[in-house]
Curated annotation (Swiss-Prot):
GO biological process: histidyl-tRNA aminoacylation
PANTHER family: HISTIDINE--TRNA LIGASE, MITOCHONDRIAL-RELATED (PTHR43707:SF1), HISTIDYL-TRNA SYNTHETASE (PTHR43707)
Keyword Metal-binding: no
InterPro entries for the chain: aa-tRNA-synth_II (IPR006195), aa-tRNA-synth_II/BPL/LPL (IPR045864), Anticodon-bd (IPR004154), Anticodon-bd_dom_sf (IPR036621), His-tRNA-ligase (IPR015807), HisRS-like_core (IPR041715), HisRS/HisZ (IPR004516), HisRS_anticodon (IPR033656)
Keyword Ligase tagged: yes
Family affiliation: Belongs to the class-II aminoacyl-tRNA synthetase family.
Organism: Haloquadratum walsbyi (strain DSM 16790 / HBSQ001)
Domain of life: Archaea
Catalysed conversion reaction: tRNA(His) + L-histidine + ATP = L-histidyl-tRNA(His) + AMP + diphosphate + H(+)
Leading EC class: ligase
Annotated protein name in UniProt: Histidine--tRNA ligase
Keywords associated with the record: Aminoacyl-tRNA synthetase, ATP-binding, Cytoplasm, Ligase, Nucleotide-binding, Protein biosynthesis
């Protein structure tokens, strides 16, 4: 017997039915904002993620050397891949570029609630504009997608920050000390809520801050008063505060400002983030970890050898999103749905298949017996797949040129002329023919 690998999951049809509904809602919402679907490879060069995603990613990669001696990895995230794609055809692509993609990713990390080694995300990205409305549109897409799933303002919140505020405050507090590892300090901020206070301060001191500097830095992060932050910081902070305010104003214009709160302790751990960053959380706190996050990464395209191209994106993950939806009671029902089951009795398959073909032409879900089962077994199967209507094609009925239509919810049934079904109805029900 072969066991399933730790951190990997099987999805049987009922669960996939619910997952497909959620993915469809995410992708449909993205389409309504003008995002176009792209497809991406499963393997990329290992070095691309080591170089672009930052410290710590290398130990999480499912990496190996292929038969050609190339170091490759199963992709752990999508942003470097879509950045490479933009560079490959940068001159031919109309700006702004708006892409969406849903696919699996792989990271060898600690398995816990809402976190697996194979996981699925819907990535939504905009390339080619630094206008704050682009950041706001990413936030608006995310908010609308969650609302379309049935969530409300009491269910989720976006905690919004700006990487330049963090780096500018670090520079101000340390008097532009060149020995400060700004990226390491920001990675420490990203871990702040997940580790003990002593460990967090230890990471800041490891990044070059003194104890007093680390304390002052952390005190500033806990304020949401942008006026105070602007007076304390340098010109970088002042500019970043203005940009963050512009994004929040645009978010208000798009009608989703109620979901956004300033939270300077939000940092995002990947090194390529540059400007506005945000994370989505369960507003009740019951789901403690971040549901998903995103932000601006204006330098990534240029670092791949392309023309300077601002970019911003978000990536809702299905695993943590399912926890939020289940907590709020809006996760889709995990059960099969079937429009019609055609039950055959005796040598009636030619008539049954004709009816099935005509119903399927109109996009109905139709099953027909393919196992030569008894009447009772077929009815039991129809019930197990939640068939709404059972069409009984029996030899005796056909002698009278009739078939039986049974409503599985009410149990009512009636006979109709076989040539009259399905007739002019795309999806005829018992009520249509009675």
């Amino acid at each position: 017997m072969y066991d399933r690998l730790k951190g990997f999951r099987d999805f049987y049809p009922p669960e996939m039915t619910a997952r497909r509904q959620v993915i469809d809602i995410l992708e449909t919402t993205a389409t309504q904002y003008g995002f176009r679907e792209v497809g991406t490879p499963t393997l990329e060069q290992t070095q691309m993620y080591v170089d672009k995603s930052g410290e710590g990613i290398e130990e999480e990669l499912y990496a190996f050397s292929d038969d050609g001696g190339r170091d490759v990895t199963l992709i752990p995230e999508l942003t470097p891949t879509v950045a490479r794609m933009v560079v490959d055809k940068q001159q031919a692509l109309s700006k702004p570029i708006k892409w969406v993609s849903t696919r699996p990713f792989w990271r060898y990390e600690q398995v816990q609630q809402g976190r697996f080694r194979e996981f699925y995300q819907t990535n939504v990205d905009i390339f080619g504009t630094a206008d704050p409305i682009a950041d706001a549109e990413i936030l608006a897409f995310a908010a609308d997608a969650l609302r379309n799933l049935g969530l409300t303002a009491s269910d989720f919140e976006f905690r919004v920050s700006h990487r330049d505020i963090l780096s500018g405050l670090l520079a101000s507090i340390t008097n532009d000390d060149a020995d400060i590892d700004t990226r390491a300090a920001i990675r420490a901020v990203d871990k702040r809520a997940k580790i003990e206070q002593a460990e967090y301060h230890g990471l800041l001191t490891d990044a070059g801050l003194s104890y007093d500097q680390a304390q002052s830095f952390d005190d500033l992060l806990t304020t949401a008063d942008l006026d105070e932050i602007a007076t304390v910081g340098n010109d970088i902070v002042t500019t970043a505060v203005q940009n963050l305010r512009s994004v929040l104003a645009a978010v208000d214009d798009l009608g989703v400002g109620e979901f956004c709160d300033i939270s300077l302790t939000t940092a995002r751990g990947l090194d390529y983030y540059t400007g506005v960053v945000f994370e989505c959380f369960d507003a009740t706190g019951e789901v403690s970890r971040s549901v998903f996050g995103g932000g601006r990464y204006d330098n990534l395209i240029e670092s791949f050898g392309g023309q300077p191209t601002p970019a911003v994106g978000v990536a809702p993950g299905l695993a943590p999103l399912s926890l939020l939806c289940q907590r709020a009671g809006v996760w889709p029902t995990e059960e099969l749905t079937t429009d019609y089951y055609i039950l055959t009795v005796g040598d009636t398959r030619s008539v049954a298949t004709r009816i099935a073909r005509e119903l399927r032409v109109n996009k109905n879900t139709v099953e027909i017996d393919i196992a030569d089962r008894s009447f009772g077994a077929q009815m039991g199967y129809a019930d197990s797949i939640n068939a709404e209507t059972v069409i009984i094609v029996g030899e005796r009925d056909l002698e009278n040129d009739e078939i039986t239509i049974k409503d599985m919810n009410s149990g009512d049934q009636t006979t109709v002329p076989v040539e009259a079904f399905p007739g002019d109805h795309d999806a005829p029900t018992y009520e249509d023919v009675v």
